[in-house]
């Protein structure tokens, strides 16, 4: 499939259509939020206030995050760690940080295509990094890297924090892509509905291991462009998919939120 066709498919698949229901994160009011140049409708008033009040009605016992080691035997195999060797860390004053990759999570949606957040593949100036700097370790768990793919084309979807990445290798030989949910399926989400995800969050001083999350739907943002959830979300999980219980369709991408470093006095 050509890149232009992929983008049209993504748009038609509701990640960025006029009736878009796309991405987002929701957390406790006690911690700081990620700051970047992308517009976050979930942070706008009064959406933030109403979502917070609703989130307080959802018990923290309904949320979970745990190391996941069985992706080789499941549909979650299509998810992996995205590495950006020319990301925001290149602008750090700390030499050790400059040597690190900027990273996030991606999901295979086509034989040669995965999707992630645009801020994951951005350079320090907010532009898409060249394809040669982007790679995808599908199904990675720590030092176990069964599949390593190289980007051939990186496309940022206009007016959204979404990127479509084309790969040199045919990932479809190794995994079945996960489809993007329809508008109708996304709009069927109700308050406190369970959503599932797998990503590569910063946990125990490491961002190379896969973690499985259970999160809860709170509401759609004011302009209908974002899914607000109550979640245990950490840096590195950006771009991870919001999935149904069968892991068969993507409602959106986990993108931003509070307590990204997990150091808030609030548990989540």
Regions found by a protein language model. Name each.
Residues 37, 74-135, 219-221, 244-247, ...:
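Catalytic histidine site
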Residues 25-103:
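Protease-domain processing segments flanking chymotrypsin-fold serine proteases, especially trypsin-like
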Residues 83-87, 165-172, 230-233:
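A structural micro-motif recognizing beta-strand termini
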Residues 1-29:
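Sec-dependent N-terminal signal peptides of Gram-positive bacterial secreted proteins and lipoproteins
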Residues 130-217:
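Serine endopeptidase catalytic core focused on the charge-relay Asp
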Residues 251, 255-268:
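C-terminal cap/linker of serine protease catalytic domains
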Residues 114-116, 161-168, 227-229:
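A generic structural motif
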Residues 232-254:
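Catalytic nucleophile loop of clan PA
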């Amino acid at each position: 499939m050509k890149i232009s066709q992929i983008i049209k498919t993504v748009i038609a698949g509701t990640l960025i259509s006029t009736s878009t229901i796309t991405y987002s994160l929701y957390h406790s009011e006690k911690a700081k939020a990620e700051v970047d140049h992308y517009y976050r409708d979930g942070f706008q008033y009064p959406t933030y206030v109403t979502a917070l009040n609703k989130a307080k009605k959802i018990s923290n016992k309904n949320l979970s995050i745990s190391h996941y080691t069985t992706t080789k035997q499941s549909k979650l195999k299509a998810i992996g760690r995205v590495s950006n060797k020319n990301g925001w860390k290149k602008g750090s004053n700390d030499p050790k940080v400059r040597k690190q990759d900027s990273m996030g999570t991606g999901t295979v949606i086509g034989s040669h295509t995965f999707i992630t957040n645009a801020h994951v593949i951005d350079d320090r100036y907010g532009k898409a990094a060249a394809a040669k700097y982007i790679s995808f370790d599908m199904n990675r768990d720590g030092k176990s890297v069964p599949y390593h793919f190289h980007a051939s084309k990186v496309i940022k979807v206009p007016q959204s924090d979404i990127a479509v990445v084309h790969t040199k290798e045919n990932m479809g030989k190794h995994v079945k892509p996960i489809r993007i949910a329809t508008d109708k399926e996304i709009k069927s989400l109700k308050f406190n509905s369970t959503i599932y995800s797998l990503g590569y969050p910063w946990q125990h001083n490491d961002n190379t291991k896969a973690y499985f999350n259970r999160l809860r739907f709170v509401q759609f943002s004011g302009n209908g462009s974002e899914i607000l959830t109550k979640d245990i979300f950490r840096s590195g999980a950006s771009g991870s998919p919001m999935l149904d219980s069968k892991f068969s369709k993507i409602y959106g991408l986990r993108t931003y939120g509070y307590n990204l470093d997990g150091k808030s006095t609030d548990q989540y």
